[in-house]
Structures are given as C-alpha cells and as structure tokens.
Amino acid sequence: RPTRERDLEMLKKSAYAMLKNTGYEEISLSSLSSSDYSQLGELVNFLIDEFGSKGINISLPSLRIDAFSLDVMSKVQDIRKSSLTFAPEAGSQRLRDVINKGLTEEVILDGAGQAFEGGWNRVKLYFMLGQPTETEEDMKGIAWLAEKISERYYEVPKEQRNGKCQIVVSTSFFVPKPFTPFQWAQMCTKEEFLHRAYVVNHEIKEQKNKKSIKYNWHEADVTVLEGILARGDRKVAKAIRSAYEKGCLFDSW
C-alpha cells in the first residue's frame, strides 16, 4: 500500500486555523493509523508547545496498537487527558486473521498496558459485528477481550493508576462495500444485527469487571440504509431525491 502523508507545515497551519475559527478546545490527529505518521513526534511537540498552556486537548485516535508509541503518549499525558482509541475490529484471533487485521491478543494487551502505565485510564475499543464467517464465539470474544484489558489495568501498581478504569466498547455493523474483498458477502438483517449486539451486551454483563466496561452499538436501521446506498445502483438516486423533497436534510445517513 503506498503511503501518502500530509505536509507537516500544512498541518501546523491547519491547527492554527481550526482553533482560531471554531473555538474548539481539542485537536484530534486522525488517520487510518496516526502512529505511522513519520513526523508524528515533531507534530505532537509543536502542538504541545503552542497550545498546551492554553488547555487545548490533544486527542490520538486511530492508533494501530502494534505501532503504538509510548513516547508520544507520555508527551501528551500532562495536558487534558482524553481517552485513547484502539480498533481491534474483532474479538477473536481467528476473525482478525480472516479480515487481515494482523493483530494478536498479546500485542493488543501489551499496547493497552503501555497506555495504562503511561497514565491513561480511559480506552475506547472499536469492533465490527456481522463480518463474514463470524460466530457467537467471535461475538463473545469482544467482551472477553475488554475484560482482559480491564484486568491489565489492575495489574498496574495502585499508586500508578489514574483513578477508575473506563473502557468503552463500540461496535458498528458490517456493510459490504463495492471494490473490497468482501463486496459480495451477505449482509445481516436488522434483526440479526441486533441479536449480535445483544450477545455482546449480555456477555459483558457476565464479566468480573463489568462496571469498568460500557457498551455502545450502532443503529441497525441506519446500517441497513447504508447497505442499500453502498450496494444500490443509480435507481437509488430517486429514493434520495424523494427523501430530500420530503424534508430529509443533514440526516445521519
């Protein structure tokens, strides 16, 4: 896969412009894998020097755990901490291999452990339900992985912990997209999506550290609509226009 990166100076100017024109108090470094950006360290140092004293939060989502940088994490921990976002995508190693995620449970737990040791206590985990070949074991694996991550937090010496552990598990639903390896895969129905979310939710409630784990899932109705828009042909344009004429404007879909 060819690497394309934003120019460092352009990112600096964009940060200035966004804070000046929006009034926001957070800068989020977002990409498919923020930690792979070759100038991430220099960019983070710049943001801290320029905006840290002003209480601007620096958020680091989209971190690929196997490329997680403890050095970068330690640089931003003294500013207003936000949660760290990891995307295991699937609860089992088998399914991660199917979707070519390339992460092992050991690497995931090690990355989370580094985050906890670096002063974080809030972690967001993103998964996807309804992926090809998914079994109930894979669904329950999401809860088991969240539990193992929470256990990793409590392995950190008490004096080094930063309050109560907070793990937010979020699941979206799989939508087969054109020109992707799974473009012809079957998509779940609304009822199937909700059943899978129920399995995860029920299993989380069975875990020892369930109070440390919060679970959110995507709207099944919106996912089904997304699937129609993704797989539909030009005829779908008529439905979109009809929805607009009936008052749909800036709707989530």
Regions found by a protein language model. Name each.
Residues 8-16:
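Phosphate-binding active sites in nucleotide-utilizing proteins
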Residues 20, 139-253:
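Auxiliary Fe-S-binding modules of radical SAM enzymes
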Residues 1-9:
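Canonical Radical SAM [4Fe-4S] cluster-binding loop centered on the CxxxCxxC motif
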Residues 5, 102-105, 187-194:
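Short, conserved loop/turn and helix-capping segments at secondary-structure boundaries
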Residues 16-168:
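Conserved SAM/AdoMet-binding glycine-rich loop
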Residues 1, 38, 94-95, 179-180, ...:
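Short helix/loop capping segments that flank catalytic or ligand/cofactor-binding pockets
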